[in-house]
Amino acid sequence: MTSKTLPFHADTVGSYLRSQPLKEARAKFAAGELSREQLTEVEDQEIAKLVQAQLDAGIQVITDGEYRRAFWHIDFLENLNGIEGYHPEHGYKFNGVETKPYNTRCCGKVSWNPNHPFIEHFKKLKDIVGDRGIVKYTIPSPNQLMYPIQWDTGVYATRAEFAKDVQQAYKDAIKAFYDAGCRYLQFDDVYWGSLCNNHLKPEFEADKAQALENIQVVLAAKPADMVITTHVCRGNFRSTYLLTGAYDPIADALFGQTQYDGYFLEYDDERSGGFEPLKHFANNPHKGRVVLGLISSKFPELEDKTAIKARIEETTQYVPLEQLCLSPQCGFASTEEGNIMTEAQQWAKVRYVEEIAKEVWGED
């Protein structure tokens, strides 16, 4: 398995709608009616069902749906040494809706936690999947800690000093996942999306340079036989969004210089702009695959197949067809609440991605 074969031409971002038994178990756990051990047992059972559902849908790359998490990012970050979860006054404010108030902040010197629970979570998923598919594990990008609200708490004098420790923590994380058997890891990254949204601010160039440095330094530690991809997100909560903005302001750095093996890019509506920024991939010698998120994970309606194929064809002006892939635009449940659709509608979307990809590229 190399970066030439992954991502496949049909892939998914990673999160799935939480099953009803899982929702009920988490509610009982929060109310003190279930022990941690009992919740874990339900999680294990529901993840096993989810794995089978993915296989039944024809998916070759399998995730745990982020079933053990409340948020796509916080559960990982708060288990790093030097990072804590806390309850701010407000949650994340999306378009017309707000998340529950919970976030992370620096509380000490940052380092990798050798007892990080995600390593055990990965091992469990790997055991469930066995030889039936390829396991992908998703974690937040190191850039998710670069916001002032995260790092500027008095522990570090400068963001650059803080970033060095974050970079080392992520290099150690890559090694820990690799040693556990992980060969396909994904960094989910809203920070690049926020830069697209805030490119006129005076700190933009410094923020972009720091984001690029973080990724370059961390990916330099990647073993040759490990695939690391990224998903660039603009927010995904209850079928709403957080950010808007085309890729143009970040394309030279993200597309032209980073050494990811794949780039999951949102392209489901006008908020993401056009395909022209993809021309910067021609300057990137690594030739990571470009995964077009043309299928919405926010809404249940199936897109027009002819229109999707036409957009893929349009993209070949900038990226060769063989370097392109197709996926939903984001996960189906970046938080435990999930987007507003049924599980049946979710799987219809997933099967649709597989169907279109086979018609465009054939079998992987």
What is the predicted role of each segment?
Residues M1-D364:
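Domain-level signal for soluble alpha/beta catalytic cores
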